Regions:
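N-terminal Rossmann NAD(P)H-binding glycine-rich loop of SDR-like oxidoreductase domains
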Residues: 3-23
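NAD(P)H-binding glycine-rich loop region in Rossmannoid oxidoreductase-like domains
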Residues: 9, 34-88, 92, 98-101
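Conserved glycine-rich Rossmann-like NAD(P)H-binding loop of the short-chain dehydrogenase/reductase
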Residues: 26-32
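Conserved Rossmann-fold NAD(P)-dependent oxidoreductase catalytic core, especially the SDR/UDP-sugar
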Residues: 78-134, 142-143, 149
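Conserved beta-loop-beta element that borders a ligand/cofactor-binding pocket
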Residues: 136-160
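Substrate-positioning beta->alpha
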Residues: 164-169, 182-207, 211-214, 225-226, ...
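A short C-terminal helix-loop "cap" of Rossmann-like NAD(P)-dependent dehydrogenase/epimerase domains
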Residues: 170-182, 237, 273
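Mid/C-terminal beta-alpha module of Rossmann-like enzyme folds, strongest
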Residues: 204-280, 297-300, 307-339
Length: 339
């Protein structure tokens, strides 16, 4: 298969390239060349810009394209319309954030997506990100009706994830000592290893599969306590988990998902089913999940090498999520001293 990937050097795109090359496909990358341009020296690289700089794509043909870097419907529409007669199949990587709320447990792909009062908005914020992704989905499908695969991942984790939303916990548990853990060990969470997502997506592309698929995991109930216990086992650390109540965290202004990644207050009815998304359709289509310990082990190993990356230091080394050490100490002290 002759495959075009829009992006391809940061996170999911990187593993799509690796999976495609491992399966003997011919790969072409289209991006600005700003992130890890030294990767894949034998792969054709077309330089350009999603926003108005698509000239390098004109006059070419591929069997399929995977769009890993679309956030604005205008931009996705431009590439999809340009490629409509040049490719047989278009995959758009979307997000479960397209759903406006998660009040229902087990929400599947039939749930309505979010909308914007002003569909011309192009500022990507926490409020607009999901509806913009939904509009991107529509733009791709309109350009290639019946030939578009829409993948809606949940939280993607693993090596080369600079968001630190999962990496924070892997690193923090490995450091050992008393660790502030949110709420209680039994609350459910969902994640998907970037390599599992990439390999499944590629298999779907090979089959020219169309339609909409939620893609997170695993295929069993995973609790946050399971994640921390696995991190401790893999790193062989002496970490001690102090479970701090949700009420205390809210009262002390702890920011969900940012200061304490993965944690969403259960008191928010709109988020009740956030970690109970149905992925039955994707699993039936062949999505499989590696052992959590493998994800933790590989993430921990990669995190130890971040200083050696060719990414800019601000991106590579500056934590993007998680409690600052002094903030964690302060909160633990307040928790132990409460009356």
């Amino acid at each position: 298969m002759n495959l075009l990937i829009l992006g391809g050097t940061i996170f999911l795109g990187r593993y799509l390239v690796e999976a495609a090359l491992a399966r003997g496909h011919q790969v072409t990358l289209f991006n600005r060349g700003q992130h890890s341009p030294e990767l894949y020296p034998g792969v054709e690289k077309l330089r350009g810009d999603r926003d108005g700089g698509l000239a390098a794509l004109r006059g070419r043909r591929w069997d399929a394209v995977v769009d890993t870097s679309g956030y604005l419907p205008r931009v996705v529409r431009a590439s999809a319309e340009l490629l409509a007669d040049a490719v047989g199949h278009y995959t758009f990587i979307s997000s479960i954030s397209v759903y406006p709320h998660f009040r229902v447990m087990g929400q599947d792909e039939s749930a309505p997506v979010g909308t914007l009062d002003d569909p011309t908005v192009e500022e990507v914020t926490g409020e607009s990100y999901g509806p913009l992704k939904a509009l991107c989905e529509q733009a791709a499908e309109q350009a290639l009706p019946g030939r578009t695969l829409i993948v809606r991942p949940g939280l993607i984790v693993g090596p080369h994830d600079y968001s630190d939303r999962f990496t924070y916990w892997v690193r923090r548990v490995a450091q050992g000592g008393e660790l502030l853990a949110p709420s209680h060990p039994g609350w459910r969470t969902q994640i998907i290893d970037v390599r599992d997502l990439a390999e499944w997506t590629l298999r779907m592309v090979e089959r020219q599969q169309a339609g909409v698929y939620n893609a997170t995991g695993p295929d069993y109930v995973l609790t946050f306590g399971d994640i921390l216990d696995t991190c401790r086992m893999v790193s062989d650390s002496d970490a001690r988990f102090t479970w701090v109540s949700e009420e205390f965290l809210v009262e002390n202004g702890v920011t969900p998902w940012v200061e304490l990644p993965l944690w969403i207050p259960q008191s928010d009815p709109d988020m009740l089913g956030f970690s109970d998304i149905s992925c039955a359709k994707a699993i039936a289509a062949g999505l499989v999940f590696r052992d959590l310990a493998a994800t933790v082990r590989d993430t921990l190993g990669w995190d130890a090498t971040r200083a050696d990356t060719t990414e800019p230091p601000a991106r590579a080394l500056q934590p993007r999520a998680g409690l600052a050490p002094e903030r964690e100490v302060e909160l633990l002290r307040a928790w132990h001293n409460r009356k």
